[in-house]
């Protein structure tokens, strides 16, 4: 495990910058709680607060702007999109964090495009200089210093084994059968998205968290 926050070129603190987040719903936060508890045992990890558990849609350049204009433009751009049901993998250790990787679907790509267009309409042509995330994902914990991956992997695997043992059908949670094909047997749950938040985001490198002030929540369903 390496620190998520050591490369200023990619992980520079947002310092109140606007982001568009898809927040994890209560059932997903509850499902991930045992994994977060397992991660909390490791000093090299900083837990993301459950209330701020999210999938980043897009990071924006502005620190402020016409929130009402963004919401109106976003609803227009998302017309006909429908609710997203993204299959999400079991929590896994990557180089600098513990994440649940989601499937990139045509709906997710359209959501990103809608967010870009709405941001430009509301905040100007320079509003979206950043690339979207490599894939939709939820980060349970960020690396804050060097650490050994193996015990983290083992702890997460034990939680998974316990969950599967406690279910009748070998699945920890109900999932969308159609979307499941995108990830297959490694699917943990489904991330349902019918709204996003426009938020002013803050990074705490010492404890390894991203938190936010929500400026608006906007739904298109």
Predicted regions and their residues:
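Hydrophobic side chains in well-ordered alpha-helices
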Residues: 31-32, 70, 111, 152
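Small-residue-enriched alpha-helical segments and adjacent helix-cap loops
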Residues: 111-119, 196
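The feature marks the first
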Residues: 9-44, 50, 57
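Extracellular/lumenal glycan-associated surfaces
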Residues: 49-61, 133-143
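Helix N-cap motif at beta-to-alpha junctions
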Residues: 61-64, 105-108, 144-147
């Amino acid at each position: 495990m390496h620190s998520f926050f050591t490369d200023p070129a990619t992980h520079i603190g947002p310092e109140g910058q606007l982001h568009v987040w898809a927040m994890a719903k209560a059932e997903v936060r509850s499902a991930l709680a045992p994994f977060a508890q397992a991660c909390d045992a490791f000093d090299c990890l900083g837990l993301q607060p459950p209330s701020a558990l999210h999938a980043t849609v897009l990071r924006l350049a502005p620190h402020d702007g016409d929130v009402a204009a963004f919401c109106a433009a976003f609803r227009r751009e998302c017309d006909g999109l429908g609710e997203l049901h993204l299959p999400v993998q079991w929590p896994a250790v990557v180089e600098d964090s513990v994440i649940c990787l989601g499937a990139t679907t045509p709906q997710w790509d359209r959501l990103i495009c809608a967010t870009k267009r709405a941001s430009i309409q509301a905040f100007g042509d320079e509003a979206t200089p950043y690339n979207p995330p490599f894939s939709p994902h939820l980060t349970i914990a960020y690396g804050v210093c060097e650490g050994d991956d193996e015990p983290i992997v083992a702890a997460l695997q034990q939680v998974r084994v316990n969950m599967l043992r406690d279910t009748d059908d070998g699945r920890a949670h109900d999932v969308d059968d159609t979307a499941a094909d995108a990830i297959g047997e490694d699917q943990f749950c489904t991330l349902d998205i019918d709204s996003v938040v426009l938020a002013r985001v803050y990074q705490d490198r010492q404890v390894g968290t991203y938190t936010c002030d929500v400026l608006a929540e906007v739904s298109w369903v």
